[in-house]
Curated annotation (Swiss-Prot):
Gene3D superfamilies reported for this sequence: 3.40.50.2020
Principal EC category: transferase
Name of the coding gene: apt
Keyword tags: Cytoplasm, Glycosyltransferase, Purine salvage, Transferase
Main location: cytoplasm
A single cellular component GO annotation: cytoplasm
Protein source organism: Ruminiclostridium cellulolyticum (strain ATCC 35319 / DSM 5812 / JCM 6584 / H10) (Clostridium cellulolyticum)
PROSITE patterns, A to Z: PUR_PYR_PR_TRANSFER
EC numbers for this chain: 2.4.2.7
One of the record's GO molecular function terms: adenine binding
NCBIfam families from the UniProt entry: apt, PRK02304.1-2, PRK02304.1-3, PRK02304.1-5
Subunit-structure text: Homodimer.
Protein name: Adenine phosphoribosyltransferase
């Protein structure tokens, strides 16, 4: 199955000129979702050994949590500022028009733990860069980063040099 064919393109969303790639068409198709998760597992296995999977709010949760379950690893959510109930570590990152902040629980990753970052989309790499900084602030080691979709023209990998990066579908 070609998962690229299962994705829906929505023009001019969320603003004019954007070709939004909608993953819900894959999620609602059991066969496509299963294929997607098996592809994630294959990529994850190529990244070497790791202890935990980190996923960013919110679509990183969609793929990261089931992958962690499937691979018998822990899952660590990274959330937007103010959404986690315990002590956190925070990292600011750039958005197209401004800045935002991501947080992780301060005890989510032990020093030396190996981490795989999972997300739905690699565009500019800003969100992933913030995730990497959070993991490393806690003493974790990022062993790999895997995505469902990669937008090659935005050159997000440029911000991730030195890290093992792969994606299932490339546009």
């Amino acid at each position: 199955m070609d998962l690229k064919d299962k994705l829906r393109h929505v023009m001019d969303f969320p603003k004019e000129g954007i070709d939004f790639i909608d993953i819900t068409t894959v999620l609602q198709d059991p066969e496509a979702f299963r294929e997607c998760m098996e592809s994630f597992k294959t990529l994850a296995e190529k990244m070497g050994d790791f202890d935990l999977i980190v996923g960013s709010e919110s679509r990183g949760f969609i793929f990261g949590a089931p992958l962690a379950y499937r691979m018998e690893k822990g899952f660590v959510p990274v959330r937007k500022k103010g959404k986690l109930p315990y002590k956190t570590v925070r990292e600011e990152y750039d958005l197209e028009y401004g800045k935002d902040e991501l947080e992780i629980h301060s005890d989510a990753i032990a020093p030396g733990e190996k981490v795989l970052i999972v997300d739905d989309l690699l565009a500019t790499g800003g969100t992933t860069e913030a995730n990497i900084k959070l993991v490393e602030k806690l003493g974790g080691e990022v062993t790999g980063i895997v995505y469902f979709i990669e937008l090659m023209s935005l050159k997000g990998r440029d911000k991730l040099k030195g890290y093992n990066v792969d994606s299932i579908v490339k546009f």
